[in-house]
Amino acid sequence: MQLDKQTENNIQITFRNIIEKTCFIDKLRSITGVIKDRFSEHDPRDTDKITYPCEYLFVVILFAGMAGYKTKDDVWHFWDSNSALLNEVFPDLQGNIPSTATITRAQRMLESDVLGGELKSIMSRQYDLVRVSRKIYATEVLSRRDVLACDGQAMRATDRLQPDGSRSGGKQITSIVSYETGMTLGQAIHNKKNQEKKDIIELSKDLDISNTIMTWDAINTHSELVEFVISKHADVFASIKSNQKLTFDEIKEAYESYKKGASPYTKTGHNATATDTVMSGSNHYTRRIVTLRAEDCLSPDVLKKWPHIKTIAVIETASMNMTTGKVTNSVRYYITTLEMDFEKYPDFARDLLAISLKRWCVEVNHWHLDMFFDQDKAAYDDDDAAFCSTIVSKFTMSVFNFAKRAYAAEENRYKGACTTPRLLRACSDISFSALLLESFFNDDARHLTHDRLSRNKKFMKEEERGHWTDMETYDHEPWPLQKFIEQHRKRKKQEAA
């Protein structure tokens, strides 16, 4: 669904006002205005009988989602816990709180094309602004160019038994995540995994991905997708496996010849190498990359299929478990449209090694969504419900990624103090959510880091899995809400048993 020009201008002006205002109540009212402009036309209810306008309901559903609360009961408790603040934002409600049935109807009004289209539009504009402000939009420095990682994720709880006795595999969500900004720039949902390639193209059509480097798994490595990315003035760094058998076999053969010292692979300017080491938990990783010119490795027929591929990259990884001493070796193969130009890219091999790590940002995002937003456990049969729930979670993760990176960059801060579970719990207080959004849309975390994170002990005390103690210095007390919801869920389980 396309925005008309007037609505688009109104949204941009309103979000600018959110940034400039200092009172978070004014910010919330501005956000409510944005939602009213966009969603009121989709409200099917009788206007004469509406007590709770859709914009009021949607803004609370959005902020509740930022705190990880999705069910109608959770949203109601979130509203009740923040009623003092929301009464100031919505004075015409006179302190009334909608029933869970009203909240359910509001959630069903959020169709995927409406909510998804609007959030994608907002994130797309924000992404362009951030790239320009950080001076990475047109940079020629390879290490500073943004990496857009594309991947699909299965919602396993939606896996269903089919009439023929097979399993459906569950709904598949394809998303694009920016490494430099941490933003999710769009998502699509389907019932089959083989839709990923089409989804990547559809999601990227309306995005300005120029001067970025797009990456994806081997299952999506097809010449049509490479052609599309080139047409958008971007580059490709893609994994390749035996699904592209002829290309894969020629690359493997060329790499074996390189290791034996064969020509032309070993000539000056025809290869580049780099090595790095990484410590992660109890594992020690040693990674070595070899880059070769595509014209040296591939036959004319294969080059005709991949006319834009300039370089082949092979990464060998040796992983040692420091506890057991066991070493595991692996080899991965990549193709890229980036040319091995040592004048333009003096540290070409090391830059590609870094890109191969940056592409995992989408996997990290998926892990957080499963662990802290229960995306993998969401058993939605309806596509709209599944889409709306997950797109709010991805929007939240975009904001959280901004906060975590900003806080990690601060000097003399407690390591790991700003984590997803801590931010989720802090967002139980809607004023903190408003502060996060202000910082995110302004791409300026000074108020966030210096005012709230450093002043409150809630980010400094944690028990296992994010449960905090010593909350005496926190001005707004969100913890009774969390405890109440946990008790409510436990009671419902006991009643069901």
Regions found by a protein language model. Name each.
Residues 126-233, 241:
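Polybasic low-complexity intrinsically disordered regions
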Residues 1-149, 177-179, 183-187, 401-497:
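Dynamic "connector" segments at or just before major functional cores
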Residues 39, 231, 327-335, 368-376:
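Short acidic (Asp/Glu) and glycine-rich catalytic loops that position anionic groups and cofactors
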Residues 46-56, 165, 324-326, 379-389:
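Structural motif
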Residues 343-380:
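Short amphipathic alpha-helical "interface-anchor" segments enriched in bulky aromatics
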Residues 384, 388-410:
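C-terminal structured domain segments
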Residues 60, 75, 99, 147-154, ...:
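Short, conserved catalytic/metal-binding motifs centered on acidic residues
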Residues 241-242, 246-352, 356-357:
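An anionic, glycine-rich sequence signature occurring as long contiguous blocks
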